[in-house]
């Protein structure tokens, strides 16, 4: 029986843990699969995705900066992908790509089940308004947060995200210059890629954003999350959480869409954390 082909598309994508995660899921469930990382720029993504389909690709994950492009290329969309305006999971069906977004479900599952946070009634600051932010915002609203403030370097994108969410009573956008005037938040989510250049100054955020309950969450993991989490710890946030748990949970959601079974994420998450600890101690 031929092995089904899957991939993660991004730019850059060599650092992605998704191939290792899905390999572990396959072993756990007894499903044979070939999952690779494919680097594609925005300009090359459409052609690269078509080549992948022509070569028998059955499904794909999509990461930065391609999530909104994947949304545009999908022939059909799930409700959560349509609401997000971004796609992180593609399923090949009858010669067409179906788009979904598992980011929000992955984040909420990690925060509520693994980290033990109660999101109900919480005030949330969302940094960023691109594909990553769009993917998680609807799920945070569904989880029962009381208010969300979206801040982005481009205020037009923040406004567009707020309009798309369609909940003006709960969701507002503010200028980045207004951060000192926003009060405090129980949840601060970094959905930007500002940490990629490892500039600690990228997150010189006002300490007034933090209260005694604040959880600071970076949707990135590894080196890209270092700067934001360093700020969170210096600001004495109660929790400083990277995106590794979300990554594993959204991957499990994607795996279930492709294969009809949801794998156990705990052993995969634990193995990745252990590997991370070994890498840090080896530095």
Swiss-Prot record:
Annotated positions binding shikimate: 16-18, 63, 88, 103
Top-tier EC class: oxidoreductase
Catalytic activity: shikimate + NADP(+) = 3-dehydroshikimate + NADPH + H(+)
Entry EC no(s): 1.1.1.25
Superkingdom field: Bacteria
GO biological process terms held by the UniProt record: amino acid biosynthetic process; aromatic amino acid family biosynthetic process; chorismate biosynthetic process; shikimate metabolic process
Keyword GTP-binding included in the entry's annotation: no
Keywords: Amino-acid biosynthesis, Aromatic amino acid biosynthesis, NADP, Oxidoreductase
CDD domains noted in UniProt: NAD_bind_Shikimate_DH
Any single GO CC term annotated in Swiss-Prot or TrEMBL for this entry: cytosol
Gene Ontology MF annotations: NADP binding; shikimate 3-dehydrogenase (NADP+) activity
InterPro entries assigned to the protein according to its UniProt record, in alphabetical order: Aminoacid_DH-like_N_sf, NAD(P)-bd_dom_sf, SDH_C, Shikimate_DH, Shikimate_DH-bd_N, Shikimate_DH_fam, Shikm_DH/Glu-tRNA_Rdtase
Residues annotated as binding NADP(+): 79, 128-132, 243
HAMAP family: Shikimate_DH_AroE
Subunit text: Homodimer.
This protein's name: Shikimate dehydrogenase (NADP(+))
Native species: Xanthomonas axonopodis pv. citri (strain 306)
């Amino acid at each position: 029986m031929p092995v089904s082909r899957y991939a993660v598309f991004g730019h850059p994508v060599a650092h992605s843990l998704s191939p290792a995660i899905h390999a572990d899921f396959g072993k756990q469930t007894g499903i044979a699969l070939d999952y690779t990382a494919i680097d594609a720029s925005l300009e090359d993504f459409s052609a690269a995705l078509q080549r992948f389909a022509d070569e028998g690709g059955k499904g794909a994950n999509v990461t930065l900066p391609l999530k909104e492009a994947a949304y545009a290329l999908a022939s059909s969309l799930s409700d959560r992908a349509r609401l997000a305006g971004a796609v992180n999971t593609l399923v090949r069906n009858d010669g067409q790509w179906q788009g979904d977004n598992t980011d929000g479900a992955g984040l909420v599952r990690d925060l509520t089940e693994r980290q033990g946070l109660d999101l109900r009634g919480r005030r949330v600051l969302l940094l960023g308004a691109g594909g990553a932010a769009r993917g998680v915002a609807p799920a945070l609203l569904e989880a029962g947060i009381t208010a969300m403030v979206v801040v982005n370097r481009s205020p037009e994108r923040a406004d567009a995200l707020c309009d798309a969410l369609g909940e003006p009573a709960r969701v507002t956008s503010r200028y980045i210059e207004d951060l000192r005037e926003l009060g405090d938040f129980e949840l601060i989510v970094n959905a930007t890629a500002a940490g990629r250049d490892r500039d600690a100054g990228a997150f010189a955020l006002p300490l007034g954003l933090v209260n005694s309950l604040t959880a600071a969450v970076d949707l990135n993991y590894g080196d890209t999350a270092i700067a934001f989490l360093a700020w969170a710890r210096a600001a004495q946030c109660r929790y400083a959480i990277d995106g590794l748990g979300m990554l594993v949970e959204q991957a499990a959601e994607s795996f279930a869409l492709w294969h009809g079974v949801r794998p156990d994420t705990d052993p995969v998450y634990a193995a990745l954390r252990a590997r991370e600890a070994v890498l840090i101690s080896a530095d």
